[in-house]
């Protein structure tokens, strides 16, 4: 029976994630709430669900670390870390051989180089442009009139490499519509956009330097086509955690434990990780992944 | 901070934020011309020696509208802002303009001023950028003479060596006062915020130097040293021609950093070098141009004996800065060309650094915040003495 509990909360641009660890760094629960936009209620729901799954109350949490764009909104937060540090920490714990993290979230993408200790060595991120982020895939799905969860499977069926020159998330929609108007197969359009986005990500990778041991995290890593085309662009296989979206919150929870206890968690323990994976899968309720009625439908 | 310090600082901030108001008041009071100076190397003592007020033209915070039709969007924000100010009548207050620097974008904006304000003299002499050539020194001396002749012509006032020397002395005194404040910051005194320091420099670029020095003395007389705290120490580097937005400074400090040194034009670079009072004044002004590049090398100058990266490494040693924030004005060609060299040096010496590209309009605050905080976390987590425990977080 654990005597101390630690929480990591990642409030991103489109989802809120919460992970609870015990004092042995074992994952007790992890929860994701799809919000569509930064939402205090969505974050509260992720926290409440994670606490409920772990069978503990907020008062039982010894230390909480917030991360993501909304990190300062996290209640009871001990301190905050950027998602760069947290994704690096989470990945380093699960993949000791990792040297590079490609994290593509709802509104930004980051490439993080890790040193031998798993600490951030260098990083690059998009700043003014949503190209290549989750938002871009949402634009694609909307233009193709399909659900965001279907766009990857559709892209995997594409066989032609069509010219997609616009990398602006706003203007891309008109280019996609134009291709469809010319009679292009939606699968080819989806594949071509994925391919173009992958090359955009390659630019970020080049900024910190490509290296072996690449792990992809963030919500976009759930899209098999995004992973496939990025691997093709990199000419290199990547590893993807079973739930890549939770990696920032997991890293934050690890940091909460480490800062609170003053000890570094260095041992890779598959059992602890398994808990993370299974719990996350169990909480992946289609209801809480829709936009934006996920919150109202949970009430 | 005492009452006098606050008042004096408030005046300096007010001038920095609203140069037009100060210039209008100065003109009304003195009935003398005001000459607009383009950055970076024009020796303002020449203008001051005529009795006129030299004012280094500042970037306006106003969004660029009319200026967009005058200069292409790939001109830097500062030069487009000058074009915009010229189009909106904001430069009408100046009686003439002088420029000594051959930046192609700056020359574009000078041309706009010349075109839109045809009745105002606009004078350009190029202070040669190749510092080592055998003919450079002679040519710079000739250019200084040409500036003096033009300043006499425009203002109708002859320039004596005595008047030049007096202006050199007042500028040196002003620079020395400012350098004392910057040296105190470098040595661990955090009594003034980066925004306050920038206001001191920018107001010096606008105001009569004696008046400015008097205010500075008032600020210093009442100032109380404030020991540096445990925040991560950063050096700000770049921005050769104009002031970065103070919002950026505030964001950096909000992220848990303290700026301990810089090489910004509106910072240490502007006050780096005095003009020698022991030399004949005209020669001393030419000498200042060369000496300045040796004190803080500028990537727009070519000099084999000095380079910016070596200077930067030395500056980091002196201030104890743990990282470098490179602030690059978008489309600044000189900076863009030099930056890979700088990055290579910083990487070789394992110095954390972050490039922030600035634009005239819009600052992606949250993404910059994330990048700066990530850099600070990287420095903290890699330094055993910087590890934060729950108790100290």
Region locations from a protein language model:
Chain A
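Adenine-nucleotide phosphate-binding core of ATP-dependent small-molecule kinases
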Residues: 172-205
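Glycine-rich phosphate-binding loop plus the immediately following alpha-helix
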Residues: 38-39, 117-160, 168, 254-258
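Short beta-strand-loop/turn "lid" adjacent to the catalytic site in phosphate-handling enzymes
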Residues: 32-36, 52-85, 112-113, 121
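Glycine-rich phosphate-binding loops at beta-strand->alpha-helix junctions
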Residues: 69, 205, 209-233, 244-248
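Short glycine-rich, Thr/Ser-proximal phosphate-binding strand/loop in the N-terminal lobe
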Residues: 5-41, 45, 49, 120-123, ...
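Acidic, glycine/GT-rich loop-and beta-edge segments that sit at the periphery of enzyme/chaperone cores
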Residues: 258-299
